[in-house]
Amino acid sequence: MSRIGRLPIAVPSGVEVKLDGQYVEVKGPKGTLNFTVREPITVSKNDEGAILVERPDDERENRSLHGLTRTLINNMVIGVTEGYEKKLEIQGVGYRVLSKGPKQLEFNLGFSHPVIVDAPEGITFAVENPTKFSVQGIDKQVVGETAANIRKIRKPEPYKGKGVRYEGENVRRKVGKAGK
């Protein structure tokens, strides 16, 4: 039995979970998320209102889908109650970010032009100062993907560490060429 998959998912107050066959919908104070469960895995509610994820047998694929499904549904419950946030920071002389509203950011990252990033559905941006900002939303996957796409615009380079990085990320530094 999967160690993660067998754990019941506690549903906090204010969160409504609808189960309709293979379709799961989670509604909470921050929004609504839905998910279609792959065929051999079944989702049900127990007497206390917790969600149970079960598999028919110990086939390899079913074992992996069991833990995955439980984790995805748990992430949905956390997303609609607390939400997710990825913090990023910019390092480099003249590198900065400007907010063009909660759905758009403008980056000056050493290119000949500013780079404008639009937020996908369900994502908002918050700018703390010109070198720190965050990506927020209820869907963990979309928040992480949006943050990764922004980081990809100008990855931290290994010599001076200039670029966009996650908060707390350690950039591996290289030694420059030795002078005479």
From Swiss-Prot:
- List the GO biological process terms: cytoplasmic translation
Give the InterPro entries listed for this entry: Ribosomal_uL6-like, Ribosomal_uL6-like_a/b-dom_sf, Ribosomal_uL6_a/b-dom, Ribosomal_uL6_bac-type, Ribosomal_uL6_CS
Q: Name one GO molecular function term.
A: rRNA binding
Q: Please verify whether the record's keywords include Transferase.
A: no
Entry keywords, A to Z: Ribonucleoprotein, Ribosomal protein, RNA-binding, rRNA-binding
Q: Which GO terms describe its cellular component?
A: cytosolic large ribosomal subunit
* Pfam entry (one): Ribosomal_L6
> What is the annotated role of this protein in its UniProt record?
This protein binds to the 23S rRNA, and is important in its secondary structure. It is located near the subunit interface in the base of the L7/L12 stalk, and near the tRNA binding site of the peptidyltransferase center.
Q: Give the family this protein belongs to, as stated in its UniProt record.
A: Belongs to the universal ribosomal protein uL6 family.
The entry's protein name is Large ribosomal subunit protein uL6
Q: To which species is this protein native?
A: Cutibacterium acnes (strain DSM 16379 / KPA171202)
Gene symbol of the encoding locus: rplF
